[in-house]
């Protein structure tokens, strides 16, 4: 799957994916997210609340977002593992307000009010959902 195909799948709605992070001790967390957007072939942005994922990303900027689209059989499933590294993490300013406004439009004011920070990631690697 090339990056354009990954971007099409990544940005399809509705879809949910998981974001895996680890703190500086290597303790792993995985959480379900609907807000991440792949804005080009090298960049993912998202809004986040004040939670374990946010704390982990402050300590360790690396993460993996897994996106999956079910098929008729497991062999028909589409998906990718998108390896990420934090570039910007902002709790105010234009980027933050832009992300928050996008979440308000997509999920409502209540969801937007829960956003504590906006994150910009660079994509460091893309791998298939399953490797044989």
Name every feature range the model reports, one short phrase each:
Residues 1-132:
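Binding-site signature for planar aromatic cofactors or substrates
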